[in-house]
Structures are given as C-alpha cells and as structure tokens.
C-alpha cells in the first residue's frame, strides 16, 4: 500500500471484521522511524512507536480519524500496563520485498480498549507489545520547578550526549537526535528536547498524537541520570510501563524530566523511572509512571541479515561449557524439596526455548552455540530469562 493511502504513518489500513477490530502496517527500512533508529546495524522500531500506534488506532476506531482535532486530546488519553515483549526489527534492504507486515488489534475492556501489536503467521500471533487504553480523568499535575532543575547537576551538551548513546550501541539519525542539552545529578535528569538544525520537523511531528522521536528522547533522558559512564558493556532497554497520561496536546513540549522511582527500587540489572514531558514553563504535558528497564548484554548488535544467515557452532564436546554459561544467561535452579535440577535439564530447557523463539530446526541449535549465532536480540533474551525463571527460579544476567 502506498504512503499516500496510509491512514497514519504507523497504520496503512483498517482490516477489521465483524468479529474483531484491527489495523495493518507494512514497515520498510527507508521509513525514518526505522532508518533513524538503530541498535548497531539493526533498524528497530522504537518502543515509543508502539504507544503511538495504539493511540492512533483507538482514535480511528472511536472517531474515524487517526488524530484528534487541533488542541484536543485523544478520546482515550491514558495508556496502561504497556509491555514491550519483542523488538520489531527490519533488515536494511527491506524496501518492499522483505518489508515486515504487523498489525494492532483492539478489544473492549472495562470501558477502555486492550491492544496487542503482533505479526500474524497463519493462525499464530507473534506478539511484540500489548497494553490498555482508557480515559484520563486525573487533574493537571503541579508544574515542575525548571529553575531548580536547570541549575542542579552536571551539564551535557548535544555532542556529549550523542557520543554517550553511540557508545551504548545506538545509531540515531537526525529525527531521533532530540536531546539538545541534559542536566543530570544522581537522582534526576532534565533534557531540553530540540531537533537538530536543518531537519524538516513537520513530517516527524505533525502526523502524530505523541511523536515517537520526542517520546523516545524522554525515555533516553532517564538513562542520563547519574551522568554517562565512559564505558559500558550493556544496554538499558524498556520492558514495561505502568501508565502514560496525556494532559495536553504535545505541540508545546520543550523538556523531559526523569527521576528514579525509588519506591519500586532497582537491582544491578533493572531500574524504574518516572518521567514528565514539560512545556516551556514546566507544565506537565505527558506523564510516564514506572518505566521499567533492564540491562542486557550488547547482543543482537549484528546485522539482522548476518544473524539470520549465521551457522550454529559445532556440536558441544564432552568438555564444553553449556550455553547458559557463555556470558549471556546464567540460570540458578530453584531448590525443590528433592534434588535440584541437573545442569543437563537446564541446558535442555534453554535449547528448547531457543528453538521455540527462533523457529530453527532442532538439529541446528547446540548447547555450545552463542545465542547471537541464532539471531537472538536483547528482548528475546529477556523472554528466555522469564521462561527459565518460571521453570527453575531466579535468572540473572552475567
């Protein structure tokens, strides 16, 4: 389907039936949402785009238009229980032949709408993200004290910020280079949101309810809390968001204010943040509550094509270490009333999950093969962690 016929940059067509409400999108590598947002060589749809897709789909379903009238909020201005389950990755040459077709479904739920973003494969759904939309009835929050935030912390300029995120594996084009300046201390960070000079702003802002470029910048502001380490071997990826509230139209956003969510704590590999998008005088435009991130290894940074074409390593010899010890995932079996699970049981379970996720033949996955050989990315690894935890207990990153 041509861009001219699209209902929204993230929705090409309404594919609803009498039984279900759904919309379709065909993603190509040359779209700015993918071309300007990469981790390593991989074009990855930003998590912020999942939220925009849900908001615009709900407007289409309820109002018949993808965007609310100028100056209005969406009918459903709160998004709850957002889960980013898998990344949507598109190969660099996926112009038409290899473009990925995804869909979003909507289902009524307690006065709101549940949504699911997925790729259909026959009767099966590969789910990338989910959540719930509902009305926003909370009063306008108190404004932030911009004067305090602008004078309380270390200052990072655009070039410093761009270098810091490049070190973390991000390859961002102009549409996502929105952090002009960042003021950070140990507990909070304030970022000035501004597109680089020379960028045509209209295509990346005007067609959206919540422009993914700006929301992505707000999410990355949280990673600047405490300053930027000179070296890092992990990526902090968003995995869940408890609530997003829209109080005003997005037009006037100038700052992103992030702070640690100490009420919900953090660990060596997880963290929780609260983030506000603010206008020029500190009024809250958008509020994000309990953004959960997880630190994952720099895996999945190879090109998607290379990962898909990679051959597994040789079968494990008698003395080889299991894949769970290959500096990617370490499983600690839960102690049961009887003897703890054997190493073989853990390895066999992990192999079965890898086969399930990648759809490779059983003979192509070996215990000695690095997870990156099988095209696994960071979010898939998180999924493996969850499955191992459900089977054996606590799973830690190493």
PLM features: what roles do these ranges have?
Residues 77, 239, 365-366, 395:
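A broad, structural micro-motif
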Residues 340-347:
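Short alpha-helical segments that sit at the start of domains
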Residues 1-324, 328-332, 344, 383:
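Acyl-thioester-processing domains in fatty-acid/polyketide/NRPS systems
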Residues 42-56, 348, 362, 369-395:
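Phosphopantetheine-attachment site and its flanking helix in carrier
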Residues 335-336:
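Low-complexity, intrinsically disordered or signal/transmembrane-proximal segments
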């Amino acid at each position: 389907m041509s861009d001219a016929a699209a209902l929204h940059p993230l929705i090409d067509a309404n594919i609803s039936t009498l039984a279900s409400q759904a919309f379709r999108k065909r993603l190509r590598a040359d779209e700015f949402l993918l071309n300007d947002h990469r981790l390593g060589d991989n074009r990855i749809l930003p998590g912020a785009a999942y939220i925009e897709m849900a908001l615009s789909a709900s407007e289409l379903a309820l109002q018949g238009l993808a965007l609310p009238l100028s100056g209005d909020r969406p009918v459903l201005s709160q998004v709850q229980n957002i889960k980013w389950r898998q990344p949507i990755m598109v190969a660099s040459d996926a112009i038409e032949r290899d473009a990925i077709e995804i869909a979003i479904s909507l289902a009524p739920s307690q006065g709101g709408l549940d949504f699911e973003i997925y790729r259909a494969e026959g009767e099966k759904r590969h789910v990338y993200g989910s959540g719930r939309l509902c009305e926003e009835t909370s009063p306008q929050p108190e404004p932030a004290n911009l004067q305090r935030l602008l004078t309380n912390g270390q200052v990072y300029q655009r070039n410093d910020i761009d270098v810091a995120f490049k070190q973390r594996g991000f390859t961002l084009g102009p549409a996502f280079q929105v952090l002009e300046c960042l003021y950070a201390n140990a507990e909070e960070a304030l970022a000035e949101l501004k597109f680089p000079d020379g960028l045509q702003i209209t295509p990346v802002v005007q067609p959206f309810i919540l422009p993914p470029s700006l929301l992505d910048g707000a999410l990355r502001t949280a990673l600047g809390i405490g300053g930027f380490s000179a070296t890092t071997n992990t990526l902090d990826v968003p995995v869940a968001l408890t609530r997003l509230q829209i109080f005003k139209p997005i037009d006037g956003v100038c700052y992103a204010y992030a702070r640690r969510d100490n009420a919900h704590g953090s660990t060596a590999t997880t963290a929780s943040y609260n983030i506000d998008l603010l206008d020029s005088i500190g009024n809250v435009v958008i509020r994000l509550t309990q953004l959960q991130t997880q630190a994952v290894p720099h895996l999945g940074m190879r090109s998607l094509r290379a990962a898909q074409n990679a051959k597994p390593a040789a079968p494990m010899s008698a003395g080889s270490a299991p894949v769970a010890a290959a500096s990617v995932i370490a499983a600690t079996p839960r102690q049961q009333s009887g003897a703890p699970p054997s190493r073989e049981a853990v390895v066999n379970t992990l192999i079965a999950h890898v086969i399930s996720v990648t759809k490779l033949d059983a003979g192509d996955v070996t215990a000695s093969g690095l997870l990156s050989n099988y095209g696994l990315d960071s979010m898939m690894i998180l999924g493996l962690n969850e499955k191992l935890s459900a089977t054996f207990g606590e799973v830690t990153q190493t």
